[in-house]
Amino acid sequence: MSISKYFTPVADGSLTFNGANIQFGADAQGESKKSYDAEDSMPNPANQLNDITFQAEAGEMVLVLGYPTSTLFKTLFHGKTSLSYSPPGSIKFKNNEFKSFSEKCPHQIIYNNEQDVHFPFLTVEQTIDFALSCKFDIPKGERDQIRNELLREFGLSHVLKTIVGNDFFRGVSGGERKRISIIETFIANGSVYLWDNSTKGLDSATALDFLEILRKMAKATRSVNLVRISQASDKIVDKFDKILMLSDSYQLFYGTVDECLTYFRDTLGIEKDPNDCIIEYLTSILNFQFKNKNLGNLSNSSSASVLKTATGEVTKYTYNSDFDLYDQWKHSSYYRNIKQQIQGSSIDDSIKEVDPSDVSPIFNIPLKKQLLFCTKRAFQRSLGDKAYMTAQFISVVIQSLVIGSLFYEIPLTTIGSYSRGSLTFFSILFFTFLSLADMPIAFQRQPVVKKQSQLHFYTNWVETLSTTVFDYCFKLCLVIVFSIILYFLAHLQYKAARFFIFLLFLSFYNFCMVSLFALTTLVAPTISVANLFAGILLLAIAMYASYVIYLKNMHPWFVWIAYLNPAMYAMEAILSNELYNLKLDCSETIVPRGPTYNDVPFSHKACAWQGATLGNDYVRGRDYLKQGLSYTYHHVWRNFGIIIGFLVFFIACTLFASQYIKPYFNKDEIERNNSRLTRWLPFLNKKRGTRSSARNDSKYVGIPKSHSVSSSSSSLSAVPYQISPSNKEMALNDYNEQPITETVETQKHIISWKNINYTVGTKKLINNASGFISSGLTALMGESGAGKTTLLNVLSQRVETGVVSGEILIDGHPLTDEDAFKRSIGFVQQQDLHLDLLSVKESLEISCLLRGDGDRAYLDTVSNLLKLPSDILVADLNPTQRKLLSIGVELVTKPSLLLFLDEPTSGLDAEAALTIVKFLKQLSLQGQAIFCTIHQPSKSVISHFDNIFLLKRGGECVFFGPMDDACGYFMSHDNTLVYDKEHDNPADFVIDAVGNSNSSAGKDTAEEALTLNKEAIDWSALWESSVEKKLVKKETARLEDDARASGVDYTTSLWKQPSYLQQLALITRRQYICTKRDMTYVMAKYCLNGGAGLFIGFSFWHIKHNIIGLQDSIFFCFMALCVSSPLINQIQDKALKTKEVYVAREARSNTYHWTVLLLSQSIIELPLALTSSTLFFVCAFFSCGFNNAGWSAGVFFLNYMLFAAYYSTLGLWLIYTAPNLQTAAVFVAFIYSFTASFCGVMQPYSLFPTFWKFMYRVSPYTYFVETFVSILLHNWEIKCDMSEMVPGQPLTGQSCGQFMEAFIEEYGGYLHNKNTFTVCAYCTYTVGDDFLKNENMSYDHVWRNFGIEWAFVGFNFFAMFAGYYLTYVARIWPKVFKIITKVIPHRGKKPVQN
C-alpha cells in the first residue's frame, strides 16, 4: 500500500509469551465469556490462563480462538493496570517486558472491539479527517490522500458526506459503521494490534477485503496483529500466518493453519467433517472442552481418540478436560519447537530492547494542534445535532422575549428596584438551568471520548478543553441574544457601559456554570448521581446568590457558601451596575399616604423602603444596595476578578477530572453493580423463585432425532429437506428427543411482494424488488450497504419515513390489517435492545405473555437451547449472549406467519451460529416461514437454507432461488466464474460474483468498477429478463392461488392478545422490577430529596416573625419548587430506557398498546416521587419553625404530594414528547423558567403588564406558591425588628397613634409606639395575612387551588399522551424537524440503506 510509509511501528517487534500464567484484572473482564456458578447462576469470570507459550513475529497475523480471547486482549491492552503474570513465565515485546513496554509506549498497543461508538452527527469525512489529523502531522493534501485511499480500500467513498449515525439516528449502514471503526483503528498507528471480533456485521466479501488489507499493512509496517473472529470462511483463515487456540484455562495449540489441522486431525485423531470449514472444526473442539464433554465424541463414535506412538503401536487416549488436551500439546513437537524458537530469540544479541526514544511519541502532534483539531470537531459534532441546538436557541429567544415583556419598562421606583433585582436573579438562574440541561449530552459523549483517548488521538484534557471552548462560544451567542432582547425590553439603563457590564458578567457567570456542571458529569458515575449533585448545587447557587436570602440574614453556618458562589458576585455586580446612580421614586411606598395626608408636609413622612431617609421622597440606589442588600458598586470589578478566578478554578478541576479521575463510563458495569447492591440488600429484592437447575451444558433441547427429513430443494417453495448422511449427525446430534415447536402453525401461508421500491428523499434504497416467502428458510444476502435491513423493515411494515411503493400480499390478498400482521410475525433486530435489569427469564416471559400463547414451559426450552441461565440479569450478559436473548425474545412468541431475523448470527462463534441456524431450520421444517439476513455464513451454515434472496448495492434483486441453483446461475452468465462444490463456500461465491461486478477491486461505485472492467455485468437487469425470474413469478402465482383456494385466514390463528388491563399489569410489574433493582436511581432520588430538604430547612432555620421572615417564607416555598428540576431530569433518564426499547423494538412488533408504556411508568414513578417527597417535607418543613399544628402541616404535606405528582407527570410528558434526552432537558429548563417567572415571586402581580396578567393564572406555580405561603403565614403574628420599622414624625400636638390612625385603617400594619409624640415606629404588617393580601394571595384560596392543582396534573397526563401520539404515532415532530432542517441545511447527505 502506498500509504504504508506513513505508519511507523517499532522495527521488527515480536510478541512473545513464554510459559506465562496470566491473571485477568477487573479492567479486562466484563464482555468476555463468563462461567457460571452452579449454585447461584451468577457470573463468575474466568480469571487465569496457564502456561501460554507462543511467539508472533513482526508482520505476522495470528488468529486467536477460544472464549478467553476477548479477556486476554483487554488484559494486554490494559497492561499497565490489568496485566499480571507470575514467574517464571514472561510476556515480552521484542526484548522488553510487555508490562514495562505498555507503560512506556501505551500508544503502540491498539485494541478494537466489536462495538461501534461514534459521534452520530459527524459525517464520514469529518470522522476520518479528525483521526488522521490527530495521528499524522503532515500537510492537509497528504492527509486527504490517505483518507481517500482508505475509504476506497474499504468501499466507503460513496458515503463521504453522509452522517455516521447510530442505533437511534439513521446514517450509514451498520457494516459501513464497522468499517469506519476499523479505519480509525488502522490510523492509530501501533505496533501491536488486538482485533476483537472486528468483522462482526461485515459480509464475507468485505471481511475478506479487510483481512487482505490487514495482511498488506502487517507485512508493510511489520506490525503484530492478533485477531479474534467468531465466524470466517477458509479463505479468511488462510490469510493468517498462525493460529493460537485457548481453552478456558490452557493453551491447546499454536502454529500455522496446516500444522493446526494436522495436529488435531492426524496426531490427536479428531476427525473433521468434510462440510465443516476450518474455524467450525476448531471451534467445535473448544466448545466441547468448554462443555466439559469428551472430545472423543468428535471422532467416529468412541470417546477415545486413536493415536500412534513412535513405535507404531496404536493406543487410545480419552480427553476428559481441557487439561488433557493441554497436556497433549505440552508434550507435542510443536510445543518443543516454539520453546526452542523463543529460547533462540532470547539469546540473540541482535534483538535489542525497545528504546522509547526510537518510538514515535505518544501524541504525534503538539498540544496546540490537538486543541485546534478537537475544537474544530467539537463545532462540527454540535452543529450537526440541529434538534438540540435549535431547541436551545428557540428556548433562549422565547424566554428573553417573554421575560423582557413581563418586566417591560420597569419604572424608576422603589418597587421597580425589586423588579430589577428579580430580573437580574432570573437571568442568572435561567442560564444555570440551561447549563444543567447540558449534562445528558455530556454523558453521551463519554464512550466516544474514552475510545479515542485509548487510541491516543488526543489527551483527555485537550478534548475537554475543546468542548469547553465550543460551549463558551455557543453560550456567548445565546447570552448576547438573550441580553439584547431582555435588556432593552425591560428598559434597563440605556447606556453602553451599563449594558456591556451586564453582558460581561452574565457571560462569564454562564461560563462558570458550564464548567461546573461539566465537572459534575466527570466525577459522577451515572446521570442519576450527577443529577443528585446538580440538584444540591442548584439550590446552593439559587439560595446563596444573596437575593433569596440577603447576605446579612444568612445563618452563620452556611454563610460561607455565599462567598464560594459565583452567582453572589455576579448578582452584586450586575445589580450594582444597574442601581448605583439611580434615584428611585418613593411615591408608591410613602408612609403615611392617602387623601388624609395630601396636605401633610413631606418632612412628616418617610419612604417604607430599605435605604430611605426621613423627609425624602426618593431612595438613592447606592443606599438601597448598601443597607438592603449589603452591596457596593466599588465591588464590581473586584467581583469580576473573583469570577475569573472561579472560572479558572472550574476549568482546571474539569481538566484534572477528565485526565485523572476515571469516570464510570460502562453502563453495563453500572447495572451490574446495581444488581450486586440489590442482592446485598435482600429486603429490596426477594428471591425470585428457585435457581435455574434445568440448565445442562451437555444437552440441548431441540430437534427430535426421530424427525424424518427427505427430498430435495429444487423448488422455491418449502419442500421436505434432506440432510445428507455426512450432515445428519451434525444436524441432529446436539438435540434431545423433546420437540421444540409442537404448537407452531402448520398451515402454509405465503407472503409475496411485487415491485417494491423504497425512497428516502431523493435516494432510492430498494429498487423494484419482487419475491415471496412461504414455509422454509430463506437467506437474504448481499454485500454491506446493499439494503438487506431496509428490505426487511419495508416488508415487516417497520419503516416510518420515506415513500414505499409496490404490493405486499398475504395469501394473495393485499395487506390491510397492519396490527394483525405485526402480531403474526417475529422480528429479530441487529441492535440488541433489552432492559438491563430484567432477568433472562423475565425478558422472555414478557414477550411470551404479550405476543405469544403464554406457554411458560416453552420458555425453558428456548432458554436451554440458547444456553442462557434463566435467572441471570441482562446486564450481566456479554454481547454474544445479548444477541441470543434477542433471538429468544422472538422465538417464544411462536410467530404464526413469518419470522424475520436481521443478522441473527452476527458476533456469534461458529458453533453458536450453527446451533441457531439448525434451530431455525427445524422451525422451518415444521411449517414456519423464515426470512433471515446473514453475514459470513459458513458452508455448513448456508447448507441449511432452502433459498437465497440476493441483493446488490442499490437494493436491486439479482437472484432468488435455491443456493445450489444460484452458483450455476452466475456461472452460466459469466464464464470467468469458477465454483468448486467440494471446497468453495457457495455464499462467498455468490457475494464475490455480484461484488466483483458492482465494486471491482474494492471500488465503491459501479462507475469506478466500469473503468476497471468494461464488461461488468448488470446482474439486476439480467435477472429481470431471466427464465428463473419467470419461474419465480409462476411459482408465486401458484402458491397464491392455493392459499386463496384454502380459504384460511392467517388472522384466525393469532394468539389472543391479552386485554388492556392484563397488558398494563404485566408492564407495570416489569417497570416495578426494573426500578426496584436500579438502586443507583432510587438512592439518588431519596438522597436528593432528603439532602435538599435538610439544606433548605437549615438555610431557612427557624424563620423569624418579621419582615425578612415574610420574604424568607415566600422564597422557602419557591426553593422547594426549584428541587423539581433535577428530580425531573432523574425521572427522564430512567423513563428514557424503557421508551427507547419500546420505540425501537416493542412498538414495531405491536407488543402492547403505547398508552400502557406511559401509564405503567406513571404508576411506578408516582409512588416513588410521593415517598421521596415525603422525606423532603419532613426534613424541610419542621426545620423552619412554622406552625407545626397538625392541620397546617397536614394541608401543606397534602399539597406538596400533589406537587410531586405534578413535576413527575411534567417530566414524563416532556421525555415522551421530546426526540431525545438532551432536548427534553432543554424543555425542562424552559418550562420551569417560564412558569416560575409568572407565579408572582419574581415580579409582583401589580407590576404585570396587562398582556401577561393571564399568565399569572395559567402558571401552575402561582397556585402552588400561593397555597404553600398561605398555609405558612395565615394568622402569623408579625413583629418587626427596629431596623425594619418605618420612621415618621407626627404633626404637632398629635400622638403617633392619632397621626397614623387613618393610614393604618386603610393599609394595615401597627405602631410600635402609638402614644409617642416624637418619632413614630411603624411596622408594615400586623399578621401574615396582610402580607398575603399585598402579594395578591389569600388563605381562602387553599382548597380552590387544590382543585386547580389537580387540573394541572390531569393536563400533564393528557399532554403526555398527546405528545407521545403526535411525536411517535402520528410523527408530527419529524415533520417539524424536517422543516427546520430545510431552513438550516445539513451538511451530510441522505442516509444509505443497511
Curated annotation (Swiss-Prot):
Membrane topology of the entry: Multi-pass membrane protein
Give the location in the cell.
Membrane
Recorded GO MF terms: ABC-type sterol transporter activity; ATP binding; ATP hydrolysis activity
Q: Which domain of life is it from?
A: Eukaryota
Q: Which Gene3D superfamilies match?
A: P-loop containing nucleotide triphosphate hydrolases
Keywords, in A-Z order: ATP-binding, Membrane, Nucleotide-binding, Repeat, Transmembrane, Transmembrane helix, Transport
Q: At which positions is ATP bound?
A: 782-789
Give any single GO term for biological process.
sterol import
The transmembrane residues are 421-443, 468-490, 497-519, 529-551, 558-575, 636-658, 1081-1103, 1107-1129, 1156-1178, 1193-1215, 1224-1246, 1346-1368
What Gene Ontology terms describe where this protein resides (cellular component)? cell periphery; mitochondrion; plasma membrane
Q: What is its main location?
A: membrane
What ranges are annotated Cytoplasmic (topological domains)?
1-420, 659-1080, 1369-1394
Q: Which residues form the ABC transporter domain?
A: 33-273, 751-978
Which function does this protein serve?
A: Transporter involved in the uptake of sterol.
Tell me its family.
Answer: Belongs to the ABC transporter superfamily. ABCG family. PDR (TC 3.A.1.205) subfamily.
Protein name as it appears in the record: ATP-dependent permease AUS1
State the species of origin. Answer: Saccharomyces cerevisiae (strain ATCC 204508 / S288c)
